Amino acid sequence: MSCNGCRVLRKGCSENCILRPCIQWIETADAQGHATVFVAKFFGRAGLMSFISAVPDSQRPALFQSLLYEACGRTVNPVNGAIGMLWTGNWNICQAAVETVLRGGSLRPIPELLTHGGGFAGFPSPTSEEASEICTEMLNLQQNDSTDRNIYHHSRFSSSRSRSTMDSSSPTKRKRLSSEDQPSSELDLSLIPNFPIKQATPSSTRRRSVTPSMNSEDSGTTTTTTAFCDKGDVYGNGGGETTKLLNLFV
């Protein structure tokens, strides 16, 4: 026989049904069906089954009860739900909403919960001493947290700025920046690298022999002497000997 939850959801039920133990704490069969339909509409049928399957068997009744109270509290107080109503001292309204659902009634949001008797947006009212202390402690924690974050971001920014300043103040950096800032007076479009030209001294200048023409007899080979060497042999020959070299520039 199908349980009341599976019956209203029109799904198959078996002996290992995960929904059956979740609604056994509700007294009547109609109330079980109303609670199942309300929770399934709020969280979705697949979401409800996923929540139930994610917890052990012993915790499933408490889970379904928590989902029912949260769905009713969120319907009545859309901003903070059941937790906000418990915090502001309006838990009796949440319990009344649950009883209304079990009887088959409908719920609607109550705007007065946001501004009347519970502070703005569900926060504790200043008239409650305990609630004021809790709210003050939370605000102090938030301010300290934000101050720490600001100090952290400021220190990161300061360290990065000082590091960039130190980098820009190095001699190599300044030299490179100054060379980049100076405009070039001419365009260097030459493919030959600009190396310093060594000026030949008069003492090292030697007279080159006349290149033979194409019609001359010595166009194939040219004769050079090694008489300019001060001392020592050249290519293993004695000083003053002549060597014939092939003239490739014909």
Swiss-Prot record:
Pfam families: LOB. Disulfide bonds: none annotated. InterPro entries: LOB. GO terms for molecular function: transcription cis-regulatory region binding. It comes from the Eukaryota. Residues 145-227 are annotated as: Disordered. Expressed in young shoots, roots, stems, leaves and flowers. Residues 157-170 have a biased composition (Low complexity). This is LOB domain-containing protein 37. It comes from Arabidopsis thaliana (Mouse-ear cress). The gene is LBD37.
